[in-house]
């Protein structure tokens, strides 16, 4: 891997930050998901620049951006497309839906019925759509950012655990600081700077392939697995007091995504090998939405993040000598 390959990520962030103030965590996670071929579930109140963040990111890579506002009257055909009868020709023509884009914002995904949510999640997983007898692949790269409003829950359709598990990351977005909000108001009430394209979609796909080559030491895989299995059996890690708070822990998909996301984060940070800190930094965003908490946790006002922070503190951080990392990379690249 060329060490300079991390620099396009820096230029991309620079361009996005011309428009977006703050939200560094969300922006970094967007890039990680894009490089790791994952999708993001974002939870936050309206007005925190979620739409603008992904739209600006699309501009920086020369990709196509589309937004779907999820509502109770939405049907799957509104997402994936349908076949329309042409009276002039007497034939059916296929009209592709808005999921055929590079970056898709699924706004307030929990406001649409389960069959619509399932249609989107199927596209996310399969990266293709079948309409009639024809199958159409979505463009590459393809990233879905789905949002949920944590305040308004009346009239919503909560995502089932099996579907939430399909998202690589769940990111919590909070309010900006006073200083950041001042800059936001100042910037949004004047002419915005133009965002320059720093990559093509083809170059981004090439970078995804470079991320696949980032070396992950077996001890880091063991570290990730221990984190995830601790959510299923906290008593095995000296955390028996957490057992009654967790009904179901994270699935093996969490371990897989933790390695994929940690590898992409290492690439963003300019390395061709992952460190324990990369795995640790991604742990909350990868695991938090995969926990099913008990009623006791809800009654005691205990959140998934509270439990995860205790688990992460208990799992010992492995030491990976730099010499072993270099040897591993040489073997891998041989």
Show where each model-derived region lies.
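C-terminal engagement/docking regions of AAA+ P-loop ATPases
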Residues: 1, 236-334
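Conserved C-terminal "switch" segment of AAA+ ATPases
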Residues: 2-6, 19-20, 156, 170-241, ...
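Pre-Walker A (pre-P-loop) alpha-helix and adjacent loop at the N terminus of AAA/AAA+ ATPase modules
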Residues: 5-48
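Conserved alpha-helical scaffold flanking the Walker A/P-loop in AAA+ ATPase domains
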Residues: 29-32, 85-105
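Walker A/P-loop
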Residues: 34-71
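Conserved beta-strand position immediately N-terminal to the Walker
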Residues: 40, 104, 142
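Walker B catalytic acidic pair
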Residues: 44, 107-108, 119
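Canonical AAA+ ATPase core
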Residues: 86-91, 108, 112-116, 124-214, ...
